[in-house]
Curated annotation (Swiss-Prot):
Name of the protein described by the UniProt record: Small ribosomal subunit protein uS12
Recorded family membership: Belongs to the universal ribosomal protein uS12 family.
Source organism: Maricaulis maris (strain MCS10)
Cross-referenced PROSITE patterns: RIBOSOMAL_S12 (PS00055)
UniProt cross-references to Pfam families, sorted A to Z: Ribosom_S12_S23 (PF00164)
Molecular function via GO: rRNA binding; structural constituent of ribosome; tRNA binding
UniProt function note: With S4 and S5 plays an important role in translational accuracy.
GO biological-process terms attached to the record: translation
Amino acid sequence: MPTINQLIRKPRKDKPKRNKVPALQACPQRRGVCTRVYTTTPKKPNSALRKVAKVRLTNGHEVVSYIPGEGHNLQEHSVVLIRGGRVKDLPGVRYHILRGVLDTQGVKDRKQRRSKYGAKRPK
């Protein structure tokens, strides 16, 4: 442990804050083109086939992003908008695709939390 005099001579250094979504480059969202749409399995205690897409962004980055909701219409060459936000049980997936924007359709027959899934108000 340093003495007070040592701390006066050379103060403690702050740890640099790590950027959790580097591909967005401080933007709220980014547009990109799907290069591959596939399913993957989650980490140990969970079991499912999670839908993900590899997306090439307009800034040149290529990222893996999660497709939320039940069912989707995405395929290769679909233009999508991505936002930050990781999926805890999928390692390497740090972005979400926004539903109901550009080529991505909203979730069909969604009644609650519709704004998160790009679903229109039911009649």
